[in-house]
Amino acid sequence: MSTNEGSLWGGRFAGGPSDALAALSKSTHFDWVLAPYDLTASRAHTMVLFRAGLLTEEQRDGLLAGLDSLAQDVADGSFGPLVTDEDVHSALERGLIDRVGPDLGGRLRAGRSRNDQVAALFRMWLRDAVRRVATGVLDVVGALAEQAAAHPSAIMPGKTHLQSAQPILLAHHLLAHAHPLLRDLDRIVDFDKRAAVSPYGSGALAGSSLGLDPDAIAADLGFSAAADNSVDATAARDFAAEAAFVFAMIAVDLSRLAEDIIVWSSTEFGYVTLHDSWSTGSSIMPQKKNPDIAELARGKSGRLIGNLAGLLATLKAQPLAYNRDLQEDKEPVFDSVAQLELLLPAMAGLVASLTFNVQRMAELAPAGYTLATDLAEWLVRQGVPFRSAHEAAGAAVRAAEQRGVGLQELTDDELAAISPELTPQVREVLTIEGSVSARDCRGGTAPGRVAEQLNAIGEAAERLRRQLVR
């Protein structure tokens, strides 16, 4: 049987919790990462108590000195949680009381509950964590942009349903992976608007009667505002769910990029060669070079999706306000951040180190009659209704299949027999270069448009980098 010695809540209990309850309740094995934020918030809370007339100058200075000493010991590892500590809050209060005594150390708890405290600390930690993740995402975007810039004219088969569809620029395809990641960064910027609301001053759920100033502590801790509703402030974890969604979405976007790399590096495709430093071998097959980073990215995406789903399931049926279920809110989010901090540098390095086999991609670009749409659209430009043009292009594909040749290898007579509008001038678009150049619309794969897109992505990345600084 445990005791209530050092507990934050034991006064009305005749004895301590059972060993099983103490083990179940313990959270220092994951919430200790909040310790620096807890100490920062305690400094700010000390000042709020002083301004409210609840501490003398001597008491204020004593608490601040004790907190500074404790912070140093936490930072260098000389102070940490004991097996008897329930959570980060009780561990740090024990450390503070050891330094300043129970009378002074016990004054810091006035006007705050673990309910508003942990909600604030979680927001503080998460606002920093999303910025670390964002830096890693920007590195992947940068690697994609650099590869796109290095291959401005390389042409590859564009695919739908994993079937050859139309020729596109390799740079266009690479930037198609950068755009979703930039949207993820926009989500992080937008998320911070809602995360930057301080629950401090809400107490357990009803606020405080001690004349404290929630706006002052919000400003001291870098929040943009104090919460408008104390019940909501202590109970809400939509900010955590929103972050978990953004993390899962980043993982999904990385997984789609990883899938392309896995397929492209296969013998059958042969689009890319993996660098030795960013691939692994086989314990039995000497010839293997495996895309493990990409495969782990694909696998970890499921883990982050699971973290999001688990958190939402935890939140879905809780009555207001705080419930102990919310102890389960942090581990999935902490894990998602940890996995992305492992994965993002590896993906950035993998992308940057890829060697593209541009000749093979160019050779495969017209395979599968990928120029058929160009033929149909050329006829449309000659005034042929698209339905008729589509049928003529299909007939041309059938004729080429029967001969076992590409569309560009059909003779002038064969083309004319299919449609009198198919004059020799159609050959201008029956090349992969002509095909990509013809798609000169906004967002298209023409070289000039892709160059514009590359510049825009660079500008967007710089804008986001500035927005994420605080």
UniProtKB/Swiss-Prot annotation:
Asked if the record carries the keyword Transmembrane, the reply is no
SUPFAM superfamilies xrefs? L-aspartase-like
Which terms are listed as keywords in the entry?
Amino-acid biosynthesis, Arginine biosynthesis, Cytoplasm, Lyase
> GO terms for molecular function, please?
argininosuccinate lyase activity
State the species of origin: Mycobacterium tuberculosis (strain CDC 1551 / Oshkosh)
Cellular compartments annotated: Cytoplasm
State the similarity comment: Belongs to the lyase 1 family. Argininosuccinate lyase subfamily.
Q: By what name is this protein known?
A: Argininosuccinate lyase
| Reaction(s) this enzyme catalyzes, per UniProt | 2-(N(omega)-L-arginino)succinate = fumarate + L-arginine
Its Gene Ontology biological processes?
arginine biosynthetic process via ornithine; L-arginine biosynthetic process
Per its UniProt record, what PROSITE patterns does this chain match?
FUMARATE_LYASES
Q: In which pathway does it act?
A: Amino-acid biosynthesis; L-arginine biosynthesis; L-arginine from L-ornithine and carbamoyl phosphate: step 3/3
GO CC field: cytosol
Q: What EC identifiers does the entry list? A: 4.3.2.1
Q: What is its main location?
A: cytoplasm
EC class, as a word, reads lyase
